[in-house]
């Protein structure tokens, strides 16, 4: 063979489809390409004999560099490619048990041979090694979570064993992991911390707040359709407090379902948001300052009272024809207003204070009240009539509180007839 006339050609090997082996080969090659660039085309023939009848001897003299691999010639037609190991980065993704993703604020430490470092919080929910720290083959490392993101708890598992073997393969706690672009991926989930909240129920009495028991509140959460669904209901205790726990982020609302006996019911509908870190966002001002837990406050008012006077004769039968006058705070009313005779008199919407009930007209044949009747309604809802406490005056629901009074008139005793001897 005339070596002066030798030419160099190129042949491309591609991984066959559905081939899982690590060996690629081509047989019966008859043509080569003159170039190895984008104009690659197998048009260069391979004659078996030269012009002197001598057989050509073909061999591969070199392999064009494959990025990321080193080359080794085994024989005239066989080359071995070995993937070059590059030190590895670590990327931890932090998620929440609530379904929220990419939590910031966690702290991870990595230790190993000649390595003791803290991962960098990238502020996008991922954590990676400092730029000057990479994981080497043939080494073992321990990853430790030392601090959970805000609003979350450290799990029972806080350490992970990372091994990079001599071949550069990676395993975490014994399970093989696939790297991408020299990065080891690892997702870690933290449990969302249960968030305690409260609402305190009170009323004003003599210029001071007085806590109220037996009010019922509902904690509601907005669903995907935009409507609120009740999560829990609780009654206030003797300190006026209802206690709730929030187990996931979302949009919430606190609603009063029923007030204490004798008091109005005001829904409130206090809307607030809990973000993925367990922080509450609320635009209202009714927040208890310096409370150990986030606490809403909710004021209720004593409902007005209705006084119903039943006029009766001394035999307890209804007696019509009387008139009554009630005077007190913002009140000076005489009934009946229309002049029609009645045995029932209703004075409505009375607020706490002292009242005087006077019988201004007595039916003929009966004795009127000797003294006016004193009625006292206190700010705590208790009622006395002439110093005697009246029971069962507080009413639930929307109806006013009710005071009932029976006023009995005695019939006049007729004077004896007198006369002389005729």
Give, region by region, the residue ranges found by the protein language model.
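Solvent-exposed loop/turn and edge beta-strand elements of beta-rich ligand-binding domains
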Residues: 1-422
């Amino acid at each position: 063979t005339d070596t002066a006339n030798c030419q160099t050609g190129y042949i491309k090997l591609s991984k066959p489809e559905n081939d899982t082996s690590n060996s690629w080969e081509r047989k019966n090659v008859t043509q080569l390409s003159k170039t190895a660039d984008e104009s690659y085309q197998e048009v260069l023939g391979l004659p078996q004999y030269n012009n002197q009848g001598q057989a050509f001897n073909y061999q591969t003299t070199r392999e064009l560099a494959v990025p990321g691999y080193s080359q080794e010639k085994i024989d005239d037609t066989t080359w071995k490619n070995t993937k070059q190991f590059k030190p590895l980065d670590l990327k931890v993704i932090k998620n929440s048990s609530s379904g929220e993703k990419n939590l910031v604020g966690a702290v991870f430490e990595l230790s190993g041979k000649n390595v003791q470092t803290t991962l960098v919080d990238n502020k996008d929910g991922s954590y990676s090694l400092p730029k000057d720290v990479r994981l080497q083959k043939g080494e073992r490392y321990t990853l430790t979570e030392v601090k959970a993101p805000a609003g979350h708890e450290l799990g029972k598992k806080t350490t992970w064993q990372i091994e990079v073997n001599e071949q550069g393969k990676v395993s975490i706690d014994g399970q093989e992991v696939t790297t991408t672009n020299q990065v080891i991926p690892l997702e870690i989930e933290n449990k969302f911390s249960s968030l305690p909240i409260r609402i305190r129920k009170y009323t004003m009495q003599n210029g001071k707040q007085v806590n109220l028991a037996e009010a019922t509140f509902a904690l509601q959460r907005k669903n995907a359709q935009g409507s609120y669904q009740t999560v829990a209901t609780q009654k206030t205790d003797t300190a006026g407090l209802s206690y709730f726990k929030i187990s996931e982020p979302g949009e919430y609302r606190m609603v009063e379902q029923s007030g204490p006996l004798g008091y109005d019911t005001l829904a409130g509908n206090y809307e607030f948001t809990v973000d993925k870190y367990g922080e509450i966002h609320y635009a209202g001002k009714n927040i208890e300052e310096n409370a150990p837990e986030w606490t809403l406050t909710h004021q209720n008012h004593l409902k007005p009272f209705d006084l119903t006077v039943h006029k009766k004769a001394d035999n307890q039968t209804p007696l019509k024809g009387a008139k009554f006058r009630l005077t007190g705070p913002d009140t000076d009313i005489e009934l009946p207003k229309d002049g029609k005779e009645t045995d029932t008199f209703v004075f409505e919407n009375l607020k706490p204070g002292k009242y005087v009930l006077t019988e201004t007209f007595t039916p003929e044949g009966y004795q009127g009240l000797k003294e006016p009747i004193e009625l006292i309604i206190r700010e705590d809802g208790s009622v006395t009539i002439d110093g005697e406490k009246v029971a069962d005056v507080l009413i639930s629901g929307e109806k006013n509180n009710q005071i009932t009074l029976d006023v009995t008139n005695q019939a006049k005793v007729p004077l004896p007839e007198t006369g002389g001897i005729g």
